[in-house]
């Protein structure tokens, strides 16, 4: 289906203006207003980071969500992401969920448009309408998600399937609508408008990122999702995303997610009236045969658009085996320990982990002045004065969305064939010369990352030729003889991003080689200073360029006068009964792809249903302590660290915790092995790490053992050795040297913290366990040691040692 010329032209040049970038004061005011109703929740606000497949239920046994790891076939996710990536565009409609900024988000499928200025309601979204020929690319991923949903929540799936009007189904599934989000960290919200009797599904289609977990804000649970992961969940619970975890400022990342749901308003009487009106109108057109011949009214249930009630969960590290699919073999045993550990007055957590699950006066949280804005990755940078267009993040990210408009297939609809041919030739010539020079540079230095632009080269002349053609393409798209300054800004930004991508994708150059900054400088030469090169050229070259410029202008004007832009009915005015015209059969056998139902059966085979059985026998827990390397009566931090460290703000902040001072004043924990502890049917034994017993147990707890094993290979081997002793799972209790808010901190604060944190925690380990120069690791370093499957991370709240508990399955990954 050809794109609508008028709409596309408006979109091409719809870039943020200088005013739209707003002053810092306006941005701050907008942010403060947005987070009042939609706050951001960081990783620190939760107790559990859940990494594996599992079924998460609330305090009354109702499903919050079912997460399935790598549940989508690669081909299905890839096909869908390739099409849907362009659906996520800058939109102010969801700015309140993005700290007052416009996120990259969009909808596809069908939508009701209630409360929208769009005149015609209850129909295809503009994206599906404009991409109807390519739309079947989403069918596999929609089918696979639907079958996963049906297998894990059959009653909800059936209720949704029975309610959705057939005319607005996506490929026969119980989904009417897709919401596509790109690089969008959402603040706390519920999905208003989703069908109350069903669930929503979210899939991560593509990305390279860390963090950005799906957080269930009222339950203290984060679900980490990576590409191909799927979660079926109650979207009427408040949910959000945690911070993106960047190692350094400006680190590149991407993330594309898709939410699948039934938009309940499409099943309300007003929508049915619209379907019938369009159907009756279509009957007057004898040349049109609708795909759907009648509209069957269905019972839509009661949709109140209210948040789901919250029935809290008591969390502990032993809660994880109760929900993780790969640990269901030890779920009943874990529930025994969990119930005892979370009972009022219980001290089991201190016995097993060395400290309680929560400490009220532990290391204090950061003030807002020390943190980055939650949506800071999208914030605009100051305008660059180095070149011909604005290099703000907002301008460049908008251009990334629109660079497709300079592809030949798009241009063929809007400029003359003659001008299009000139564009192809000029673009191809420049890329050929760039490629030739880049090959020569790599031959001299294979490690080279930067392209050396030679102003007297043939490539430089070809670039100016391409710019001449590009200028006429711009005017051809505008349909006029001169462009406004803001239109030039928009076009040249898009032009530079397009060429940068072409060098990377077609010539396999690093993105930084032909950087936007480099292209910007050369565009400035062309737009503002190119004449100084022209006057120094030989007369014959000047004549050639003048004649070429005239030919390009004539080619552009020929396209404007020849009726090349034949208009068709656009989406806004489309009033036809075109429901399901985009649908078609997808032949999985022909592609040799596993049918969705069989795939879902395999993926969900370990999903637990029903209540956990009661454990009758004894639950045996082995707690392993570090060998006592030395006896330490007390540590005087004033004598142990330099005055520079002691006087730093970060050291003072860490030492301000009363809980820290209790640790410093307490007796060493491992001078001798504690006696065994029996609590109901739970039996807890202790061992030093160099003298592990040989008899089997249900669970092994490694209490700060790895901190006294500095070698990573040996530490990893020790986890494997411990896992061989238990039938259930291993709990790896260790200090995370990075503070809980690490990835939300400003760079300067992070650097100050890094300078003192290892020494601080080493002092506490020396007091608590007698460990000399403890190896305190980051979360990433700890998780890299795990040789099998890390199911989750539990964070002891307010812990003075910043203690975390990684729950490790004994079996190796499949």
UniProtKB/Swiss-Prot annotation:
Region (Thymine dioxygenase): 62-264
Region (DNA-binding JBP1 domain): 392-561
Cofactor, free-text remark: Binds 1 Fe(2+) ion per subunit.
One Gene Ontology term from the biological process aspect of the record: base J metabolic process
InterPro entries: 2OGFeDO_JBP1/TET_oxygenase_dom, DB_JBP1, DB_JBP1_sf
Domain of life of the native organism: Eukaryota
Keyword field: Dioxygenase, DNA-binding, Iron, Metal-binding, Nucleus, Oxidoreductase
UniProt-recorded Gene Ontology molecular function terms: DNA binding; metal ion binding; thymine dioxygenase activity
Reactions accelerated catalytically: thymine + 2-oxoglutarate + O2 = 5-hydroxymethyluracil + succinate + CO2
Site (Involved in J base recognition, conferring specificity towards J-DNA): 525
Main subcellular location: nucleus
Pfam name, any one: DB_JBP1
GO cellular component: nucleus
Catalytic class of the enzyme: oxidoreductase
Binding sites annotated in the UniProt record for 2-oxoglutarate: 255
Enzyme Commission designation: 1.14.11.6
Binding-site residues, Fe cation: 189, 191, 239
Cofactor dependency: Fe(2+)
Subcellular location: Nucleus
Domain characteristics, as noted in the entry: The DNA-binding JBP1 domain (DB-JBP1) is necessary and sufficient for binding to J-DNA.
Subunit structure: Monomer. Binds to DNA as a monomer.
Family under the similarity heading: Belongs to the TET family. JBP1 subfamily.
Task of the protein: Dioxygenase that catalyzes the first step of DNA base J (beta-d-glucosyl-HOMedU) biosynthesis by converting thymine to 5-hydroxymethyluracil (HOMedU). DNA base J is a hypermodified thymidine residue found in the genome of kinetoplastid parasites, which is localized primarily to repetitive DNA, namely the telomeres, and is implicated in the regulation of antigenic variation. Also specifically binds to base J-containing DNA (J-DNA).
The protein, known as: Thymine dioxygenase JBP1
Species for this entry: Leishmania infantum
């Amino acid at each position: 289906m050809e794109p609508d010329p008028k709409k596309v032209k408006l979109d091409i040049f719809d870039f943020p203006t200088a005013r739209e970038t707003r002053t810092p004061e306006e941005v701050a005011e907008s942010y403060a207003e947005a987070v009042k109703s939609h706050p951001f929740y960081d990783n620190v606000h939760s107790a559990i980071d859940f990494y594996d497949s599992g079924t998460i239920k609330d305090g009354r046994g109702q499903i919050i969500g079912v997460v399935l790891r790598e549940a989508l076939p690669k081909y299905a996710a890839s096909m869908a992401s390739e099409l849907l990536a362009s659906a996520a565009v800058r939109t102010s409609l969801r700015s309140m969920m993005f700290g007052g900024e416009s996120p990259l988000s969009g909808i596809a499928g069908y939508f009701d448009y209630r409360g929208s200025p769009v005149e015609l309601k209850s129909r295809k979204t503009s994206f599906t309408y404009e991409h109807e020929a390519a739309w079947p690319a989403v069918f596999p991923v929609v089918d696979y998600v639907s079958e996963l949903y049906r297998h894990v929540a059959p009653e909800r799936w059936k209720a949704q399937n029975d309610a959705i009007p057939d005319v607005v189904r996506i490929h026969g599934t119980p989904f009417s609508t897709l919401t596509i989000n790109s690089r969008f960290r959402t603040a706390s919200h519920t999905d208003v408008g989703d069908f109350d009797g069903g669930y929503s599904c979210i899939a991560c289609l593509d990305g390279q990122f860390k963090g950005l977990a799906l957080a269930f804000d009222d339950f203290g649970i984060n679900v980490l999702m990576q590409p191909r992961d799927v979660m079926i969940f109650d979207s009427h619970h408040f949910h959000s995303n945690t911070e993106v975890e960047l190692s350094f400022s400006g680190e590149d990342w991407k993330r594309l997610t898709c939410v699948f749901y039934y938009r309940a308003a499409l099943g309300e009487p007003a929508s049915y009236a619209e379907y019938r009106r369009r159907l009756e109108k279509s009957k007057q057109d004898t040349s049109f045969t609708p795909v759907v011949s009648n509209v069957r009214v269905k019972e839509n249930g009661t949709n109140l658009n209210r948040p789901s009630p919250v029935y809290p969960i008591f969390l502990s590290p032993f809660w994880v085996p109760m929900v993780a699919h790969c640990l269901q073999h030890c779920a009943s045993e874990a529930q025994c320990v969990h119930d005892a550990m979370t009972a009022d007055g219980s001290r089991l957590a201190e016995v097993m982990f060395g400290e309680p699950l929560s400490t009220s006066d532990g290391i204090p949280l950061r003030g807002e002045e020390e943190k980055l804005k939650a949506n800071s990755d999208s914030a605009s940078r100051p305008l660059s004065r180095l070149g011909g267009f604005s290099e703000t993040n907002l301008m460049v990210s908008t251009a990334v969305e629109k660079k497709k408009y300079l592809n030949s297939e798009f241009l063929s609809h809007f400029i003359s064939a003659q001008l299009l041919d000139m564009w192809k030739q000029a673009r191809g010539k420049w890329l050929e010369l760039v490629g030739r020079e880049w090959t020569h540079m790599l031959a001299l230095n294979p490690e080279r990352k930067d392209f050396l632009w030679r102003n007297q080269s043939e490539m430089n002349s070809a670039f100016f030729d391409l710019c001449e053609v590009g200028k006429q393409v711009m005017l051809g798209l505008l349909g006029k003889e001169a462009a406004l300054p803001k239109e030039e800004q928009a076009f040249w930004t898009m032009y530079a991003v397009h060429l940068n991508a072409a060098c990377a994708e077609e010539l396999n150059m690093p993105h930084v080689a032909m950087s936007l900054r480099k292209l910007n400088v050369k565009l400035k030469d062309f737009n503002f200073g190119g004449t100084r090169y022209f006057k120094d050229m030989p007369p014959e070259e000047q004549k050639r360029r003048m004649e070429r410029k005239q030919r390009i202008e004539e080619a552009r004007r020929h396209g404007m006068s020849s009726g090349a832009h034949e208009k068709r009915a656009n989406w806004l005015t489309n009033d036809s009964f075109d429901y399901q015209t985009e649908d078609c059969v997808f032949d999985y056998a022909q592609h040799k792809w596993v049918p969705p139902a069989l795939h879902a059966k395999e993926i969900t085979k370990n999903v637990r249903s029903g209540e956990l059985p009661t454990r009758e026998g004894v639950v045996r827990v082995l707690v392993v302590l570090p060998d006592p390397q030395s006896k330490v009566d007390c540590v005087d931090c004033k004598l142990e660290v330099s005055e520079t460290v002691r006087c730093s703000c970060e050291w003072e902040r860490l030492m301000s915790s009363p809980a820290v001072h209790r640790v410093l004043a307490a007796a060493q924990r491992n001078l001798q092995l504690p006696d065994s502890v029996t609590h109901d049917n739970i039996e807890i034994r202790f061992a030093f790490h160099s003298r592990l017993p040989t008899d089997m147990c249900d669970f092994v707890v490694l209490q700060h053992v790895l901190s006294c094993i500095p070698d990573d290979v040996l530490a990893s081997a020790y986890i494997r050795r411990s896992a061989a002793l238990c039938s259930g799972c291993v709990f790896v209790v260790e200090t995370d040297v990075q503070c809980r808010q690490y990835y939300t901190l400003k760079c300067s604060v992070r650097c100050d913290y890094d300078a003192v944190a290892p020494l601080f925690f080493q002092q506490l380990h020396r007091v608590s366990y007698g460990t000399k120069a403890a190896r305190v690791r980051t979360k990433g370093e700890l998780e890299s040691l795990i040789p099998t499957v890390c199911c989750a991370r539990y964070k002891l709240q307010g812990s003075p040692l910043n203690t975390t508990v990684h729950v490790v399955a004994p079996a190796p990954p499949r």
